């Protein structure tokens, strides 16, 4: 699979870590949705707009003809997933790409309905595997990520840092 559909939280984490540019060195077609972009702060939008202009990140607009289905997914699962979550789930299901998220509720929901989900640790593993990151940068970013996001699986990060 050569397609990644991004939820907001992973994009935000990569911007906070100041390593978003490494993401777009990966050989994947990358999308997010207009609803996810709307969730971002103006500065985060400005950063991503650079990659959108370079066609490295594509915005998948939910068309009016699709909105009823996305809204139904959201309404039937309100309190579990947000509307932007429903959009990235819908796009991942429709396009067949990996859904990238750090949101546990979205992960469980998407997996329940057959969408393959990956997280930020997988993404860093990919950047190392594809030699986008050196081993030292990989470990440095994982350490910063662990400090920034204590909800991540500490054991998984620790075994990669050693």
What positions do the PLM features span?
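Acidic, PIN/NYN-like endoribonuclease modules and their adjacent C-terminal/linker elements
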Residues: 46, 107-162
């Amino acid at each position: 699979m050569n397609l990644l559909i991004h939820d907001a939280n992973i994009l935000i984490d990569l911007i906070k870590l100041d390593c978003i540019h490494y993401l777009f060195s990966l050989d994947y077609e990358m999308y997010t949705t207009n609803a996810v972009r709307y969730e971002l702060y103006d500065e985060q939008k400005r950063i991503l707009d650079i990659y959108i202009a370079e066609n490295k990140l594509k915005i998948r607009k939910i068309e009016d003809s699709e909105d009823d289905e996305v809204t139904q997914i959201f309404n039937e699962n309100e309190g579990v997933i947000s509307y932007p979550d429903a959009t990235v789930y819908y796009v991942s299901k429709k396009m067949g790409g990996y859904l990238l998220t750090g949101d546990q509720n979205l992960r469980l929901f998407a997996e329940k309905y057959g969408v393959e989900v990956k997280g930020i640790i997988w993404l860093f593993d990919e950047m190392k595997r594809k030699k986008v990151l050196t081993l030292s940068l990989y470990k440095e970013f994982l350490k910063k990520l662990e400090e920034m996001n204590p909800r991540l699986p500490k054991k998984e990060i620790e075994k990669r840092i050693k």
